Amino acid sequence: RSSDLYLWKKMSLFFGMKGAAYEPKELRMAYETKIKEQEAALKMECRGSHVPEIDIADVFRQLFEDQAVSVTEKEIADLAKMFRAISIEELKLFPGVPEMLQRLKDAGKKVFLLSNAQALFTAPEISLLGLTKYFDGILLSSDAGVKKPDPAFYEMLLKQYHLDPAECLMTGNDDIADCHGAASAGIASR
């Protein structure tokens, strides 16, 4: 819903309060342009070898810089959370998720989260939903600079947590990103 006019009215108000004057539609267009520019730059930097992931903080920071306004990292983080809160309809878990994660933990399994997501708002959402305690490790694409289905993202997780791909199982909600990506890294999936 990042195209929603209500979102961009609120975002332009926040930017304006910080001294960066944007009209809502102008801000949305500038935001979309910055994302495309960053994605293109990352693809060039990586020579097409993987699926790059931008960090939304850099986009917001550049939007302020374009208006000659400096902001703190906390202000960027707060803006990202506001952006997310306005742009989603609700934040809820699929039924049975905490119970399933607890059963895995009770069975002595290690549970890791590998997600195509922006850390600035996803990490607080994971905490808000009470899920942090279930994970032995969390790797978010904006922190890694790469996203699923790129095998490099899976390999980062394997290396960081000293995991053997033959002993791992990937479950997810996207056949291409989750299952095919896992298979490319030698991880079984369901």
Feature roles, as predicted:
Residues 1-94:
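N-terminal helical cap/lid subdomain that shapes the substrate entry/recognition surface
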Residues 74-93, 97-128, 135-141:
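Substrate-recognition element of Asp-dependent hydrolases with the DxDx(T/V) motif
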Residues 20, 109, 187:
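Short phosphate-binding/catalytic loops that engage adenosine nucleotides
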Residues 112, 139, 169-171, 190:
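Hydrophobic/aromatic beta-strand patches that form the interior of the parallel beta-sheet core
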Residues 147-176:
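Conserved Lys-Pro-Asp/Glu-containing loop-to-beta segment of HAD-superfamily phosphomonoesterases
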Residues 71-72, 98-103, 150-154, 174-181:
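Short glycine/proline-centered loop/turn elements that form peptide/ligand docking sites
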Residues 21, 70, 132-136, 164:
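Conserved H-loop
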